[in-house]
Amino acid sequence: MIKNFYITTPIFYPSGKPHMGHAYSSIVTDIFARFKRLENYNVLFLTGTDEHGQKIEKEAIKKNKDPKVFCDEISETFKSLTKILNLSNDDFIRTTEKRHHKSVVEIWNRLVESGDIYLDKYNGWYSVSD
């Protein structure tokens, strides 16, 4: 029987260049992926960037760049980190990619149809700086 193992890094928020914390979490994830492969698991190891939100918009404005152009540049530095660290990831996904958008829409529609997503009121804390 084939044993599957799915693991991801956090999806990194490209409001700035990668730092030691990004390297650390990537290396730890890579260690788990490699270990599971040694145990003959079919491993799917993903990493990537989450390119939506106010922080990205603010940083792009500070740099006098279009948010998409800003994300293209910064995400490329995150992608290059996978090569610099010799990570064994199977894919690098950006939330602005068409394939990601298509998958999210499909999953969202399934959740709506099943009643798992519904309109209601919610109170919570949100801060761009947190």
Listing of model-derived features with the role each one plays in the protein:
Residues 1-130:
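N-terminal, positively charged nucleic-acid-binding surface of large information/translation enzymes
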